[in-house]
Amino acid sequence: AADRALAERRPAVRVDVAAELLGRLHAVDRAEDVPELAALAADQAALLRERAQRFAGPLGADPGLLADAAALLDELPRGGRRALLHGDLNPGNVLADDDGAGRRRWRAIDPKPVLGDTAFDAWPVLAQVGNPFAEEDPVGVLRAHARVLCATAGLETDRVAAWALARSCESALWRAAELGDRDAALADLAQARAWARLA
């Protein structure tokens, strides 16, 4: 039977589990009828630029940070190791199955599959395991978790941080445009600034 036991574990254990799971998931490097990350990221970059013109001022956002995020969305899909990605590997999408012999096997659910740079998949796990942005040193926590995840899953820390910066900015402007949620948008922008210190 599946359970949500991952949410009950310490952040370091949760990062280890996610890293091992990403390593297994990324073993597949091709699939039919799966969208390309490059196309998704290009659409997100265009939308980010349009939304930045409307919301950077009202949010007090750094236009340079938003421009960097859009440029990263254009550039990052051209590099990195290519594989089939989960697309939304957040802690709520990681479940444990008992194999009947008392062993637990972790699995991912609710994928939003795309083909592209494996570093793309790390952001939801790193941003949502524990509460790194509420820590006294969020950059230190992110750095430590990213090192563990990248070492186990075979990812490049700088690429993971760059994707996280870009996706945090995209998320911030989505929250502003689609939800009208200024506080959540500002929180995402603060997270993007933390990721910028790692990228």
What positions do the PLM features span?
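ATP-binding pocket architecture of kinase catalytic cores
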Residues: 1-34
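An alpha-helical support segment within catalytic cores of ATP-dependent transferases
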Residues: 11, 27-87, 97-103, 151
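Soluble or luminal CAZymes and related metallo-dependent hydrolases
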Residues: 13-17, 64-65, 141-145
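Short acidic/histidine-centered micro-motifs embedded in hydrophobic/aromatic stretches
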Residues: 43, 125, 163-167
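Short, well-ordered beta-to-alpha junction loops that form the rim of enzyme active sites
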Residues: 87-89, 165
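Hydrophobic residue at the +6 position relative to the catalytic HRD Asp in the kinase catalytic loop
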Residues: 92-94
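Active-site Asp-x-Gly
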Residues: 96-147, 154, 184
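Helix-rich C-terminal or lid/interface subdomains of diverse kinases
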Residues: 130-199
